[in-house]
């Protein structure tokens, strides 16, 4: 598998609207490279006699009635938020 570059990581972070530093981009490129290398090992497995599946469990069309309920009061909810910006909840970037 090709090594992920800092530029690719920064591009994906930008698409996800995450602000990351140069150091984080370098660290994430290395970490994501290790993850893709590990996942690449699956290509070495012989799956010729394995039936393709789309779901692990045989569950089909599990549905419930859609019932609308009143949500939280926005002002009360925002009182419990650790950090906010422009009226939105701000959470740490996780990559």
Curated annotation (Swiss-Prot):
InterPro entries per record: Asp/Glu-ADT_sf_sub_c, GatC
Pfam families in the cross-refs: GatC (PF02686)
EC number: 6.3.5.-
Enzyme class (EC, first level): ligase
SUPFAM superfamilies: Glu-tRNAGln amidotransferase C subunit (SSF141000)
Any one GO biological process: regulation of translational fidelity
Segment forming the signal sequence: none
Molecular function as annotated in GO: asparaginyl-tRNA synthase (glutamine-hydrolyzing) activity; ATP binding; glutaminyl-tRNA synthase (glutamine-hydrolyzing) activity
Catalytic activity: L-glutamyl-tRNA(Gln) + L-glutamine + ATP + H2O = L-glutaminyl-tRNA(Gln) + L-glutamate + ADP + phosphate + H(+); L-aspartyl-tRNA(Asn) + L-glutamine + ATP + H2O = L-asparaginyl-tRNA(Asn) + L-glutamate + ADP + phosphate + 2 H(+)
Keywords: ATP-binding, Ligase, Nucleotide-binding, Protein biosynthesis
Family annotation (Gene3D superfamilies): Glu-tRNAGln amidotransferase C subunit, N-terminal domain
Subunit structure comment from the entry: Heterotrimer of A, B and C subunits.
Function description: Allows the formation of correctly charged Asn-tRNA(Asn) or Gln-tRNA(Gln) through the transamidation of misacylated Asp-tRNA(Asn) or Glu-tRNA(Gln) in organisms which lack either or both of asparaginyl-tRNA or glutaminyl-tRNA synthetases. The reaction takes place in the presence of glutamine and ATP through an activated phospho-Asp-tRNA(Asn) or phospho-Glu-tRNA(Gln).
Family listed: Belongs to the GatC family.
NCBIfam families: gatC
Descriptive protein name: Aspartyl/glutamyl-tRNA(Asn/Gln) amidotransferase subunit C
Organism, scientific name: Lysinibacillus sphaericus (strain C3-41)
